[in-house]
Amino acid sequence: MNYFVSSFLEIKNTSRGLGVFTKIDICAEVIVEHSPFSSCWSAKWEDTPENLRKVVFSHPQNSDNYVIGLGYTAIYNHNDNNNAIWLTSDDGIYIKTLKNINAGEEIFIHYGDAYWSGGWPKY
């Protein structure tokens, strides 16, 4: 596999903790990251340890299983008006832009409804 985190991405402090930002203008429909995942397990969301809920994704083959994304995947913040999406496949997690994103802007994904039913404060 050719895993990568684009060199134009950077991590910065935000009011929500860390976040992923772009140093250059990015067009829509660009894959900015392809990272592996590990630590697959099966559990109900409410039984998933709280410290893991912030960093897990649904397994691509079974949404009842969870994986931990590597690379920057656990650092992207949520926004209801997200400008990127996360996609899982057998070979890893992809982060793909949905809109044009200007240099200096934060890249946001949507965590999904299950995340918010777990009791996390919504931004």
Give residue ranges: language-model regions.
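Conserved catalytic SET/PR domain of SAM-dependent protein methyltransferases, capturing the structural core
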Residues: M1-Y123
